[in-house]
């Protein structure tokens, strides 16, 4: 019994501990818990928020705990009494990175304050400043030390000392293990830097027993270390060699931390100290692991519509259901906890459906029979482990073959033909333990013969256990060595048909996609990747023919051709192609681009088949379109392909060039597709960013009449029924079935009630499945086939036991981050799933006013309304244009008085994005009545704060350089970064020198475009009378260029810094960059809703090799703005950059236009005399 009790102590995932006296506080199951340190005993819940919680910290007197909670959508500081009772929310900052760090020591009068860091009021989320927040709930006082990620304070030798941690990465150390880039962290004690050459992560700094303690992985694994206050005497106090020590905290003499789901304590920092594990057991039912129902409409993962459009197979959170469209019940097809079903595909009119399952740990195809009134049939499982990661699954019209696109570039044909029906039915009956239908004498005889066979195999208990939850009867393990299916109860015995896998073709440049069969099932077409991973070509393959398989190139690979489909009469092949080259002039820089490059194209498969868009010597029929054929082939007829001249028969549809996707053939010889509006990358094209005009339109094209019509004005996606007569449309979580060739009305539109699907989630089983699937995704997509020497299976085995402790989506995400952290590679991210439980109250965003307010004698004054930028719609203060001036006093919000201590922020809780009324009294010394204004508070102030931040730094550069240096800041390498770069480029390059600031650059993919602009050279000038000369090339730097980078310059920011140095554009000033250049492509949603990214694309440079990853790019000149520089208002980094630029100007003067002194003489020369 004692052993059983001991094991019970480690069934929970314990995190984020702190201690005070004999009490221990920690986070588990998304709540705070308290436990006694004296010995084993049950912990008790302190909060019941059931939502993500941050690190808790006891107050110095041990009576309260400050912690970070996500109860209000974003993290805010909360305070809860240790003895129980309601907690209080202390901050209403609305930032994304708020975190409690600790408490300040008591002042002589006994008062103390919470120490927290937050990006509130900053332009970037990584710029977290330290704040002191008093327990009475004032908005907090910003401390002057600049951006910090942790702060501790203590009274040492009669003096208040501050310990700061700066320059850390955006990830926790365990999420990128053995990170050695430029953002490993800098430790400061009272302005002096400690341990500058440690060479590993620094985190969790603490004052402990007269020493400085911290966590570091500079020796390969995260452990607890300490040093003297001058940085000498480094000691290691723990010896974890497999799992990282994480999230350490101290009461000043002892240290507690988490490791592998357990809590550990180090009683002192003596040289021989050793950690001990704390025996902590939780009380309660572990509610986060209990089964619960989820709304199907929020978890639709795929749909396949039946032949006539009367019902669909619907994937809901990894399970498959059969749902009639109008009335009728929902029926389970496949629903096994811990098994994920994907990519359902109807097998023609055979009454069967195929889908991908991972029931055996690898992708396999399972074939189930659709529900019938006579009862179910056993499912068959095929090709387990031989398909790779299945990306697409398409059936031929007869339902005998599946085309499979695998992650590794293989295009496979899987035989799913029906085995001998009588034998299969009989064996199913015997295996199920009941006799076959007595009315079927042939079946009964077959069953008797099978049952009496001398070598009949024994019952397969394992297979029966696997099938227990499917709702469709037993599943036969069909992954036999012979490649075929096996009958139930007969493991390893091939069935009469099915299961053979044939590789049709293999791409060497990424996966094939967009598979489609011809109406007769003889031909298969797809989009094949080409040069540079952007070009694609259309290919076709004749699968059945007297000469075997024949692969044909329909297009030549010069363009991006995708989404090929056969028309339902088999006469044409249609596809989408990005081959339009009608350039559009850029209104700002004069560049040209091709935003209207896509159209649908049509290929007559025979030269004898007329193009519906071609001219006819006899003219067109009165109704337009084509003349009816005397021998109309109809749908599903034999497809005749004349290979010669296919490429020359490619013809564009007579529709406007735009952005198209999801091309599909429908009944009546028509086609449908989605047409997307041309909009900007930042969503500012439309007056209202939430306008549905940003969503696609579903259009139908009638080939016979060469006419286009609109079916649905906006939607998310759609699926086509087997006969092409109906479409199932998903629109903002609602499903409806509509006609495929005309606009639906009240009678022809069927709204599909997803509430009939009652899906129950087993969180523990989902997490086990999601964990294994994440492991397979990493194995399949990680950039190095050899996993950079990592034994990935061993890593998965090491962390797998911790799954049984997890009890919330956030805990599962935390565990998964530890696992992916073992890759030691950038861009391995995990986003937690949204839980379906949490606080019962209504959640909305904090409202922000885009202004700096200050409290003076209990009155809240508008100190400064941020000016913003009229070229950025998101960078506008709600108070701009209201007539409110600096100095006005905010007295009421929606008629409620502003508290003199708390300020207006609590009254703006939940007001983000909605209209509120603000009442202002005149500024001090001004007369007049109060004013009421209506404004819409912001949800996110960062764009507004960012423009103000850039303007201030430009002013600094102007002042330091005497106006000779231009200044550009690039916040990222995406749409917003490109916009910001070009917003000020023309003005700033006109100055003699240029400072290009990429500090804090969040990365992206456009560094090449920025480099192209910066490498322009002035070769000459264009002079116009009464106007200033213009350089050729235009918008080129006139003189020296200096780059500024820091440890937050990341990803594509690393790339542009490397390119800047390799191209010798100019010196780089600052700090070594982040060091993360193994990029990701897309995001993978797991079965539980978690999202992971896989490092897929590794950057290599001639000069640096692979070394930029996990190291970064070192500057030419190091410069650092220390906490004291921030406190005293100095700009040493910009100062150094400007100094270098001015020095370079002395030796490399800027390009200047010529004057009119040496213009050519074009006057008429005198006529020379005759000779």
Swiss-Prot record:
It is an enzyme of class 3 (hydrolase). Residues 444-456, 466-498 have a biased composition (Low complexity). One of its GO terms (molecular function) is serine-type peptidase activity. The active site is at 827 (charge relay system), 1051 (nucleophile), 1109 (charge relay system). The record marks 1052 as: Transition state stabilizer. Residues 432-498, 1149-1171 are annotated as: Disordered. CDD domains: cpPDZ_Tricorn-protease (cd10828), Peptidase_S41_TRI (cd07562). Its EC number is 3.4.21.-. It comes from the Bacteria. This is Putative tricorn protease homolog 2.
